[in-house]
Swiss-Prot record:
Keyword Membrane included in the entry's annotation: yes
Stated role: D region of the variable domain of immunoglobulin heavy chains that participates in the antigen recognition. Immunoglobulins, also known as antibodies, are membrane-bound or secreted glycoproteins produced by B lymphocytes. In the recognition phase of humoral immunity, the membrane-bound immunoglobulins serve as receptors which, upon binding of a specific antigen, trigger the clonal expansion and differentiation of B lymphocytes into immunoglobulins-secreting plasma cells.
GO biological process: adaptive immune response
Sorted UniProt keywords: Adaptive immunity, Cell membrane, Immunity, Immunoglobulin, Immunoglobulin domain, Membrane, Secreted
Listed GO CC annotations: extracellular region; immunoglobulin complex; plasma membrane
Record's subunit section: Immunoglobulins are composed of two identical heavy chains and two identical light chains; disulfide-linked.
Native organism: Homo sapiens
Subcellular location: Secreted; Cell membrane
Protein name: Immunoglobulin heavy diversity 1-1
Length: 5
């Protein structure tokens, strides 16, 4: 998956 802000 991908995480970020």
């Amino acid at each position: 998956g991908t995480t970020g802000t």
